[in-house]
């Protein structure tokens, strides 16, 4: 554009100089007048062109790169950006009235001897639960994940200042193509994996439902054994925790045994009847507690679990077991080894035999309503316990839960409890519990 302007200027200068060469010729004079008019027109056009010509815009300054995160090399992402982390849980308030004294109070395991008719009222938010689900990173066909979950039923702590209780803290390495997984950490036991849907915190523990949570290393393999049939085999080594360890953490009879507890389960999933497959499992565990060189007691169980969906709104499930020294698995009505105190010294005498089971039916959901009914029974060998000890514990329950929306529930549960004692009167309790639940 600038070159074109200079060319027009040279032409205009040459044209302007021509009148000096031919002033006497009238024709030339006329032509000069025409040329001057054209030059004036060209000058105006040049001015217009100059006005439209703009200098090139300056290039924007480069945007400085954000500073690298502390401890990371340039170009590398923070570790958190490689993981999928989901926060979950619920807030739960339980209000309960009992017609007799129960143990421990905020929830029921069994009734207390000598407290028939001694009613009590409890109000707590300690079952509020918080958790993290972590996914990734994956390598090849292996997927890694983890779970950390806690509530506020930790030991000690005032009711309005509860302590944290770690429920789950485990990682899973899963090979989906091979249907094989490894779990390492604390989570629910391999044995007796089912539980009833109760508002009471302890899901019929010490009343026919055994199985708790322990640190463990677990291997699981799924096998196809026929048309629409799957066999799941799971085996684990887990921490053994004895009676005295529950009262005095410095005394560890489970660790003193020198080896872990062994747990295993075989579960078969197959179409029997109903709209979903039936699941039947057989499981067992064996461990040992050593209190002294002469005091060694085995802990063992043999268990059956059944899950049967009948139709979209009816599901039946239950478990049965037999074993000994099961207090660490919420069996034996909280009694594992028979003890006797002589001269201030506690002597451990015998593992307490135990048997029991439970069943439950889930009804619904219908619109916003769902219902659960069930029963459980735990019976110990009477000859294995001393006088006044608990020999039988039974519970019946029914609840109704109404969903205000997808996150908020209100539930009411009615349960009846009866605990029998050796050479003493049994104690009955009626419990009415209301729960408010907000899930996230």
Over which residues does each language-model region extend?
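N-terminal signal peptide c-region/cleavage motif recognized by signal peptidases
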Residues: 17-19
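N-terminal periplasmic/intermembrane-space "pro-region" immediately following the signal or transit peptide
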Residues: 21-104
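Outer membrane beta-barrel
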Residues: 73-243, 258-271, 307-311, 317-322, ...
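Transmembrane beta-barrel outer-membrane domains
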Residues: 80, 121-127, 161-168, 208-212, ...
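Sequence/structural signature of outer-membrane beta-barrel proteins
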Residues: 98, 137, 152-157, 187-193, ...
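Flexible, surface-exposed loop regions and adjacent strand-edge segments
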Residues: 104-109, 200-203, 250-253, 297-298, ...
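Detector for outer-membrane/organellar transmembrane beta-barrel domains
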Residues: 259, 264, 270-390, 394
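Outer-membrane beta-barrel "beta-signal"
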Residues: 402, 427-440
């Amino acid at each position: 554009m600038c070159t074109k302007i200079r060319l027009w200027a040279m032409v205009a200068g040459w044209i302007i100089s021509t009148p000096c060469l031919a002033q006497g010729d009238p024709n030339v004079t006329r032509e000069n007048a025409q040329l001057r008019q054209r030059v004036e027109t060209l000058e105006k056009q040049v001015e217009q062109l100059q006005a439209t010509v703009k200098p090139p815009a300056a290039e924007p300054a480069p945007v400085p790169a954000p500073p690298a995160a502390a401890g990371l090399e340039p170009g590398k992402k923070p570790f958190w950006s490689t993981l999928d982390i989901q926060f979950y849980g619920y807030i739960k308030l339980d209000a309960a009235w009992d017609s007799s004294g129960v143990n421990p109070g905020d929830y029921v395991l069994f009734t207390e001897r000598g407290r028939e008719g001694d009613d009590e009222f409890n109000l707590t938010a300690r079952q509020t639960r918080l958790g993290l689900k972590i996914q990734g990173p994956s390598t090849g066909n292996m997927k890694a994940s983890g779970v950390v979950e806690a509530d506020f039923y930790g030991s000690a702590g005032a009711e309005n200042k509860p302590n944290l209780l770690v429920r789950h803290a485990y990682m899973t390495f899963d090979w989906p193509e091979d249907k094989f997984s490894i779990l390492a950490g604390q989570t629910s036991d391999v044995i007796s994996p089912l539980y009833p849907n109760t508002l009471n915190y302890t899901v019929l523990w010490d009343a026919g439902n055994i199985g708790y949570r322990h640190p463990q290393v677990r291997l699981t393999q799924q096998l196809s054994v026929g048309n629409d049939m799957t066999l799941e085999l799971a085996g684990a080594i887990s921490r053994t925790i004895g009676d005295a360890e529950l009262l005095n953490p410095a005394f560890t009879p489970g660790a003193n045994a020198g080896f872990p507890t062994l747990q295993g389960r075989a579960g078969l999933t197959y179409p029997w009847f109903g709209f979903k497959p039936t699941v039947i499992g057989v499981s067992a565990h064996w461990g040992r507690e050593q209190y002294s060189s002469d005091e060694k007691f085995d802990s063992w169980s043999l268990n059956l679990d059944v899950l049967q969906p009948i139709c979209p709104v009816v599901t039946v499930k239950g478990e049965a077991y037999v074993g000994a020294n099961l207090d660490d698995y919420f069996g034996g009505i909280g009694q594992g080894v028979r003890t006797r105190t002589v001269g201030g010294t506690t002597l451990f005498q015998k593992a307490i035999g135990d048997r029991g089971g439970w069943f439950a039916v889930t009804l619904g959901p219908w619109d916003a309503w769902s219902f659960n009914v069930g029963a459980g029974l735990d019976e110990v060998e009477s000859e294995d316990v001393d006088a006044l000890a608990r020999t039988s514990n039974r519970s019946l329950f029914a609840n109704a839960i109404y969903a205000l929306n997808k996150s908020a529930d209100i539930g009411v549960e009615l349960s009846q409890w009866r605990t029998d004692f050796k050479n003493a009167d049994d104690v009955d309790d009626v419990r009415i519990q209301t729960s408010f639940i907000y899930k996230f």
